[in-house]
């Protein structure tokens, strides 16, 4: 008598896990580190005050008359808000059927689109786009449009630092600790104190490789603790002559740049009522529709407080 097996039987239920595993990354180190502010217009502006240069000859005669120098005026900066959206349309049938891993499809899509929108903003902040006004879809100037400290390769040049133009690339070169130290010194001399180094995966690994030369000492692991041997191949905190840097990898940055950011002098502004706002769109046919919209701008309160190391060969 033949044995009845699953190969010949009919009616077995599928074994589909009631969990959805998401592999795509959603970490956004720059977006997460920036302060969050609310704005009331499509063009957000701010002022930066610099002190007069220190003088070693500030001495006068007894009874001397007062002399009045022209005060140092503030510098006025501004950046446009850009509108970033994600749209979702879910059929009535899909919402009604029994689904694995989620109950309501629209609610699930809202979560996904929110994560995707954060990733888009992260990538835009680290890009090289200049500010654009209403003659085109408005665009917020990226970090490279504000930074004038750090270094570029031979033949390259920094932006003017007001958001209206961007960095000009030069000759590629390898990442070195000296480039990082110089960038930190530039920002420190102008009153900044970068606390965050953001790099692509390639440059993050290259930075850790620099520790293999013996120039860096890692204290990530408590060597006195009674535990299994741990081999340290990464440097996550770097103590420079001009401050301590937390090293953060970003999946949304190019291999040609590294940012040294002072989070005290940069923020993400969103227009009031437009911060990841969910808008239900009128149904057309048998579908539920929604738009997730945020109107945001990068606000770099003190451009000289940061540095960029550009024209890296990323190898």
Which residues fall in each region the model found?
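Flexible, glycine/threonine- and acidic-rich loop/arm segments that mediate assembly and lattice contacts
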Residues: 1-237, 241-315
């Amino acid at each position: 008598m033949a044995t009845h097996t699953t190969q010949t039987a009919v009616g077995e239920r599928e074994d589909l896990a009631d969990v959805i595993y998401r592999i795509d990354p959603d970490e956004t180190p720059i977006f997460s580190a920036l302060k969050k502010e609310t704005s009331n217009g499509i063009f957000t502006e701010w002022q930066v005050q610099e002190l007069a240069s220190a003088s070693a000859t500030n001495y006068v005669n007894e009874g001397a008359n007062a002399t009045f120098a022209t005060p140092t005026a503030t510098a006025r900066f501004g950046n446009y808000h850009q509108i970033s959206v994600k749209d979702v349309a879910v059929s009535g049938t899909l919402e009604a059927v029994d689904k694995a891993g989620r109950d309501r499809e629209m609610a699930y899509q809202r979560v996904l689109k929110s994560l995707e929108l954060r990733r888009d903003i992260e990538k835009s902040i680290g890009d090289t786009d200049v500010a654009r006004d209403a003659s085109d879809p408005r665009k917020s100037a990226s970090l490279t449009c504000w930074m004038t400290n750090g270094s570029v390769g031979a033949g390259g040049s920094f932006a003017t630092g007001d958001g209206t133009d961007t960095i000009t690339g030069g000759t590629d070169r390898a990442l070195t600790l000296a480039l990082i130290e110089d960038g930190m010194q530039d920002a420190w001399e102008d009153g900044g104190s970068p606390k965050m180094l953001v790099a692509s995966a390639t440059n993050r690994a290259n930075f850790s490789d620099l520790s293999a030369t013996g120039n860096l000492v890692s204290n990530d692991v408590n060597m006195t603790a009674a535990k299994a041997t741990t081999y340290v191949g990464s440097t996550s905190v770097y103590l420079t002559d001009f401050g301590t840097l937390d090293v953060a990898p970003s999946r949304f940055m190019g291999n040609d740049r590294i940012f040294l950011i002072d989070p005290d002098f940069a923020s993400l502004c969103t227009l009031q009522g437009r911060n990841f706002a969910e808008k239900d769109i009128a149904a057309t046919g048998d579908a539920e529709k929604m738009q997730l919209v945020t109107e945001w701008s990068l606000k770099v309160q003190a451009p000289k407080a940061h540095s960029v190391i550009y024209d890296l060969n990323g190898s």
